[in-house]
């Protein structure tokens, strides 16, 4: 089924309310698309229009209150949310702020704490001017960060979430595994990526919201840009990294392909990187930390005569967003817990301007991990 049963969302709200009680937060204000979807189940890309803000109020007790543009009322009525208030929008002079203030005053008539998405990897989806107006008119209240307790919920996936993530990863794995049957020397990056995207849709994916591609002789110098009209030639190494969704949930991993005659130094660098991911798996289990995983990869990559090996981190969380907390890096001491889903993503720049990246998606299980992606081949796939 699309989405989840109402109980899934109700349980999320109850868990948040318990954390709000512990942190003395009277009400949490949700404005960002992914958090709004997480607690309501609304499935819409209408968020791509920045004109209208949407608000969800989650009190410390009782059901959530949605305050939304009138255009969204019918759509939100299809979710489990019952208390829906609207205003006619666009209305730049008062884009829902008066309605939001009135609801907040009804819930907190005197003084209290309002939790907002103010912390790391979070943002407000309302204008700063409107947020300032809100704070000035509710000077009896403290506006504090609630992003930490929201992420504490979101980084642990439910069984129903895990099913969806496993499905989209399986779809993308199959397409990656079969891609060599469709591509050849002389095709452009765009042509190859278009084939890839079409196959993803044919296999049942919903959207490919992120697809980076790069290529070059023996390696590439970046991993975040769109494909270009560059033709793949003998000696080139191609990477495709996809963030494709099913019912809102992402996969995020890459695969590399060599074209024609690949030098020994490239194959050697690829194998070193593959071995680094093997080391990472050994440290992927509950009770260990993100830093433990990062250090394990560093034991392979941080050796004399090896070049740089990181683009800032070597993996991250995964779910309703392409990247989520935590980060796989030496400074992140987040403890791994059962039902987290993370990516393992070491980068190895074996020569200046020539990097290779391998990425896998991992579920943390009770006793260890489950590899969700089909394993990156130990030997670089060659396209002739």
Residue ranges, per PLM feature:
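Active-site neighborhoods and metal-handling regions in enzymes and metal-associated proteins
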Residues: 1-384
């Amino acid at each position: 089924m699309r989405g989840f049963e109402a109980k899934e969302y109700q349980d999320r709200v109850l868990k948040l309310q318990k954390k709000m009680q512990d942190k003395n937060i009277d009400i949490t204000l949700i404005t960002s698309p992914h958090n709004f979807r997480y607690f309501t189940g609304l499935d819409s890309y209408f968020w791509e229009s920045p004109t209208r803000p949407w608000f969800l109020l989650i009190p410390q007790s009782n059901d959530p209150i949605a305050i939304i543009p009138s255009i969204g009322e019918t759509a939100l009525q299809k979710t489990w949310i019952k208390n829906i208030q609207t205003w006619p929008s666009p209305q730049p002079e008062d884009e829902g702020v008066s309605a939001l203030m009135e609801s907040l005053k009804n819930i907190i008539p005197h003084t209290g704490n309002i939790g907002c998405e103010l912390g790391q990897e979070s943002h407000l989806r309302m204008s700063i001017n409107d947020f300032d107006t809100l704070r000035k008119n509710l000077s009896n209240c403290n506006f504090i960060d609630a992003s930490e307790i929201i992420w504490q919920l979101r980084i642990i996936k439910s069984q129903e979430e895990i099913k969806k993530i496993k499905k989209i990863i399986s779809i993308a794995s199959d397409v990656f595994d079969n891609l060599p049957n469709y591509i050849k020397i002389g095709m452009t990056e765009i042509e190859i990526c278009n084939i890839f995207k079409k196959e993803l849709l044919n296999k049942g994916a919903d959207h490919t919201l992120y697809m980076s591609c790069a290529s070059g002789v023996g390696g590439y110098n970046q991993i975040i840009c769109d494909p270009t009209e560059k033709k793949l030639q003998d000696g080139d190494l191609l990477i495709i990294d996809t963030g494709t969704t099913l019912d809102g949930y992402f996969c995020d991993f890459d695969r590399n392909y060599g074209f024609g005659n690949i030098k020994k130094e490239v194959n050697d660098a690829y194998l070193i990187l593959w071995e680094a991911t093997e080391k990472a798996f050994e440290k992927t289990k509950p009770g260990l930390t993100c830093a433990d995983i990062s250090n394990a990869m560093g034991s392979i990559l941080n050796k004399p005569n090896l070049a740089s090996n990181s683009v800032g981190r070597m993996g991250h969380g995964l779910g309703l967003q392409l990247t989520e907390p935590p980060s796989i890096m030496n400074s992140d001491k987040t403890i791994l817990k059962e039902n987290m889903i993370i990516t393992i993503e070491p980068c190895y720049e074996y020569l200046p301007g020539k990097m290779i990246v391998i990425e896998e998606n991992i579920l943390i299980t009770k006793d260890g991990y489950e590899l969700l992606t089909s394993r990156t081949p130990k030997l670089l796939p060659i396209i002739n």
